[in-house]
Amino acid sequence: MNYLSLTNFVMLYTYLKKIKDADEKKRTIEHLIQLRRQLDDEIPGKTAEGTLLLATWNIRQFTDNRRPESYMYIAEILSRLDLVAIQEVKEQMKGLEEVMKILGKNWAFIATDVTEGKEGNGERIAFLYDTNKVSFKNIAGEIVLPSDNLIQGVQFARSPFCVAFQSGWFKFFLTTVHIIYGSTKEALAKREEEIKAIATFLSNRAQNEEASYIILGDFNIPKAGDKFMNALESGGFRIPSHIKKHPTNFGKEIKHYDQIAFNLHSEYDIDILDENSRVRSGAFDFTKSVYRDEDYEDYIPFMTKDVSVPNPDKPGKNMKVKVERTGEEAMTYFHDTYRIDQMSDHKPLWVELKVDFSDQYIEKLRQEVSK
């Protein structure tokens, strides 16, 4: 199998010059080295044409609210993949733009407009792709349901985004979603209905067009085999067992929020889902290398809070000042809030797909001429 030359997808590490503080720069470099080693160990190497590394990642509130080192870590992870669906890109796309600067000129992205309304949460969704491996096939659009298929009388809270791509021999339509969340009875019912609606809608398209469709993103599925996952699979999509087994959240409770599901029609594409084809997948836990629990003290200067103290210039009045969190409070805030805001509360979920069908095609020709 041919592997891409490093020169084809090397990141722009000159971005490190943006970090002026010497200690912070040193920490970032050390953590990048650790992260790169972990990526080498856990994610397959990128190939020139044989495979496609497809992923989905909900990057929490993805805008310009992060430290430069965080953009470096996010870009490092993305650079090891070929095509990534990103959820929670905010209206101000400066965070995404910073990451694109680091990824370099061989990367491109396609993003939706902002979904309006309270449930839309001012979010976009986007696809990032390595143009060395993936081609945009000039079709893109947000999914709008027919009037007789509405969800409780309305469209999706956040419009799914469907784009046509090609990698190697594999031509496919890729749809990403960020399904509505909520714990009320009404919200739970709507979540299930949204999942069933998008799966059924795309399955009908796949069958009518005899085309291959993949749907991926944040479905807010609590666990494998529950009614939300069943809504996706009963709608006509298949989730390989090796993908189902990967929880994608951080925390004590195991959740399977993010998924990658397939509805394939080409005789060659179907091999992608062969459970015996050594297809690899995973959920990448970046906290093994960056923003680790033991690193919390390094970030105490940035984890401030507002407290009210007497105003020396105005007797009887108070004023707010910023103070550092310390001790147990700092540890808890770092674990539960700070590193989530800097990276995400989701792990990127990835799968390696075979996209070189040369052997199958040649074998088919041999059988035809042998008749």
Model region roles, listed by residue range:
Residues M1-D41, M93, N204-A211, I221-K371:
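Metal-dependent phosphoester-hydrolase catalytic domains
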Residues T51-Q61, N138-E142, K171-Y181:
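Active-site-proximal beta-strand elements of phosphoester/diester hydrolases
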Residues S70-I74, Q92-G95, V99, R124, ...:
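Stable alpha-helical elements in mature extracytoplasmic
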Residues L83, E88-K171:
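Structured beta-strand-rich core segments of catalytic domains in phosphoester-bond hydrolases
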Residues S167-K196, T200, S370:
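Metal-dependent phosphoester/phosphodiester hydrolase catalytic core
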